[in-house]
């Protein structure tokens, strides 16, 4: 199970950053707990932070960041170990529409540049309509609709 878990990244709605750690340390933590070497940690952390546009914030603490920046740190932490699958639970739920679209661009770029599969839960119909990605609609734990190039549709529910 632990080997499979290492191929999975998770992004939470509420960021789940460690408040007493810097941006760099928050992202590095994901590699430290699996025993990665210091040199490998540095390279991977800086790459992940560059991919989310926060390489210039490595010394900042979470309370010095905006909501969008905190979510990008959470995404960097989730991708730092190059997962094959990224699960995102309402990653834009705490953000305004502009920041939400910035986060969606970051996730789209990760999918395109790293080849990471992204599964995202959202109730934001604007994101669904703008992204036009595959959409699976669940109701009471059951699949009720699937769309190849999804748009939000109340009738599908």
Residue ranges of model-derived segments:
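Short coil-to-helix segment of the ABC ATPase nucleotide-binding domain corresponding to the Q-loop/switch region
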Residues: 21-29
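Conserved ABC ATPase signature
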Residues: 61-65, 69
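Hydrophobic anchor residue at the start of the ABC signature
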Residues: 75
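Catalytic Walker B motif of ABC-type/P-loop ATPase nucleotide-binding domains
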Residues: 86-89
């Amino acid at each position: 199970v632990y080997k499979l878990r290492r191929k999975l990244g998770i992004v939470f709605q509420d960021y789940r950053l460690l408040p007493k750690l810097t941006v760099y340390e928050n992202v590095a933590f994901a590699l430290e707990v699996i025993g990665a070497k210091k040199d490998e940690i540095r390279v991977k952390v800086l790459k992940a932070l560059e991919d989310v546009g926060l390489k210039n914030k490595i010394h900042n603490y979470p309370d010095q960041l905006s909501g969008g920046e905190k979510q990008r740190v959470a995404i960097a932490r989730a991708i730092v170990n190059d997962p094959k699958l990224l699960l995102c639970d309402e990653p834009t739920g705490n953000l305004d529409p502009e920041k939400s679209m910035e986060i969606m661009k970051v996730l789209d770029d990760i999918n395109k540049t790293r080849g990471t599969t992204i599964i995202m839960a959202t109730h934001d119909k604007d994101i669904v309509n703008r992204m036009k990605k595959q959409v699976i609609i669940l109701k009471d734990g059951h699949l009720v609709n699937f769309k190849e190039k999804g748009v939000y549709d109340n009738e599908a529910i």
